[in-house]
């Protein structure tokens, strides 16, 4: 099977083949040598406030993509930045009478607290804009030398002092501008291309955007080849990509709101310098709407992730965010979240049944093929989760049969395989759940048998066979002893009418 992904740049699905790797990797190939490397960059948050549900969707989606690539045998170098210098951070700092650094540090800590609850794996690197200034200077100077950027003296700087300059990117110098977003210059709204103020009087073209903006000496900023100032938003990511992953990466990802202007400008800044495509695959996730309207503070429907986590289980929220294909918009409603909460309860019951049936053996091969088929089609989580629900419900039915009627339709080894498939699918999608206490832990809590190691499935089967032999020999004292030993270790035995015995982990 071959993994295909939708590339925003080409507007079509393409076979996924990173620069250093094959398009399909078998388990034997992955185990036998160096795994192909995928270089992946995700645009991170601007750290001036708590994360909202749009952020949650973005980082759950790319966490899922990373996990699935690793499942398929790739090594993923995952980099996600923090924008820790920005006019919004400056405004928040002035409001609170704090430094920009203090504001940034606090909200970086809040970010990790929220994302940890969603079970999002940490990135390999978290570069920060303030720590990548030298790389920004090098890029801007290279763009100046190649004629793609120009400087304009800041008219507000006092005469006689060291001059300060704004530096702008000359959009019309790059003939492919608009290739990512599909927009043409004549269709674009002037001034819509950056977050550092774009109204500079010296701009040669209304479409040009800031690479560096001069700042008054009284404002936070940095010394640069162009005097005191702050970087433009877009140059920050271009510099951090190059500094951490090189000139040419496999995946550049983010929310659909970043396609234009942010990613369009990143591409335009980077490619004239390197002569190479910045990224082979550009991937973007859809918006979060609230009751059919785009989520925004102005509409009063803005929900922070912290508020949502106060109402719903983190894994129910993760389920809600993955039940819709990542490129489609998702509508947050109370009914949708209640459905996700009930769905997570069903999956938890399935997980519990899988744990009780035992986890020995390999996952059901048919289920895993179906999972890979769904996910190989541009990370099709709706199909993958539908399969997980089928497995969970089947395990619940079989568990109810065994509990109430003493038998199951499926043989024990098949139940264990289906349980293993459910757990592997959910783990690959990034879900987490409490692990069952091992026998020695339960015994220790009871003050009994504390030194016994956790029992493997094979050892349980061995003890069950010994008990069966004792019962046949009418050695009921020994049979009872084995039953009590297993009970203390969290194993329940169910004697069936045909003389066999089934077991469940508590």
UniProtKB/Swiss-Prot annotation:
Zn(2+) binds at residues 43, 237, 262, 266. It comes from the Bacteria. The keyword Nucleotide-binding applies. Its EC number is 6.1.1.16. InterPro entries: Cys-tRNA-ligase, Cys-tRNA-synt_Ia_DALR, Cys-tRNA/MSH_ligase, CysS_C, Rossmann-like_a/b/a_fold, tRNA-synt_1_cat_dom, tRNAsynth_Ia_anticodon-bd. A motif ('KMSKS' region) lies at residues 294-298. It comes from Synechococcus sp. (strain JA-3-3Ab) (Cyanobacteria bacterium Yellowstone A-Prime). ATP binds at residue 297. Monomer. Keywords: Aminoacyl-tRNA synthetase, ATP-binding, Cytoplasm, Ligase, Metal-binding, Nucleotide-binding, Protein biosynthesis, Zinc. GO terms for cellular component: cytosol. This is Cysteine--tRNA ligase. PANTHER family: CYSTEINE--TRNA LIGASE, CYTOPLASMIC, CYSTEINYL-TRNA SYNTHETASE.
